[in-house]
């Protein structure tokens, strides 16, 4: 568990609201309001919702669940409202695979990089202008799977943590700490000063990734957007660049696939911090 990720709510705590299900007033349910930046967001899908309910840093406003899905709910301080699948379809974005369950909750507050470092993180991912929310969610999920406790994103040119990201992350946004920074290059300098070996992925590098991460006590993996890759200033700020060896017939990997491979390689090749 990453305690830092669980201690940055927009608002502290969650209002106790009982344990039994109730039925909402249906007219209000069918008037969805657009999400505003910094305001409450909808999260949906079993893994995303269960993880949000288990996170004490989440302030949950509403828990909507169908009759079929209510049996899967753990005991919670949040009173579930029984709805139909059609109700959820109307409330959530088109195409949302909700599995009969959704919550409306305040977003988690991003942490400061210095706090993540002080917390004792040894594996951190840094994303340079990765803008696709599905890729971002998948990267959160891989980070959680391979022991990366922090994900550094740009304040701009990176998507907010919406329900789409949360669904792709399968609950990992509740345990992997989000950090936002204006300047990725400066963040890499800060990581280097804290003893992190910063490795940027670049297909043109002659150095294989397994050699670049071998023996590092603290590691930061840096990934750029698909197509352009790392920006020149960000690449220059990395301690070194490395590549994932792939077949010559393929030019590159999807950024979320590359992240999963890189995180695995780093977790396998790095050494525990003293």
Which residues does each PLM region occupy?
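RNA substrate-binding interface of SAM-dependent RNA methyltransferases
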Residues: 119-206
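Active-site/ligand-binding-proximal alpha/beta "capping" segment
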Residues: 199-254
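Short glycine/serine/threonine-rich phosphate/pyrophosphate-binding segments
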Residues: 134-138, 230, 255
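Structured adenosyl-cofactor binding patch, chiefly the S-adenosyl-L-methionine
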Residues: 50, 145, 167-172, 232-274
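N-terminal positively charged helical leader segments and presequences
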Residues: 1-118
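Short, ordered loop/turn segments at secondary-structure junctions
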Residues: 67-69, 85-88, 156-158, 183, ...
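Active-site helix-initiating loop/hinge in glycosyltransferases
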Residues: 45, 128, 135, 252-254
